[in-house]
């Protein structure tokens, strides 16, 4: 009976951690969409707020300021495709996601987004580290 209770407890615990790890991909996509919306509004300050480590780094801050304001477009922003930085982070990981978005009927914008994912035991957090200038539509991210 004790073994059965332990097995059930273990299964529930692992299931909870897996659910947290899988939901981080959705959180990453939502934050990437927030960046795209800020860029479409031409709100460079919002892009830097969404990437706080970039905002504190002089080179990253300058690079972001150089392109983020040029992406202003009218219309509702939609994600055409998002490839997450990591499918399921079981430890702290830094990776690069690929975001394709457009506003209204405009042409697609494709960007790479550097992401820090925390392991599920420490909360499974997602932090955007930096966003790249637009890349070619068929280009991959490093």
Model-found features: residue ranges?
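Short low-complexity stretches enriched in small and charged residues
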Residues: 2-6, 52-56, 139-141
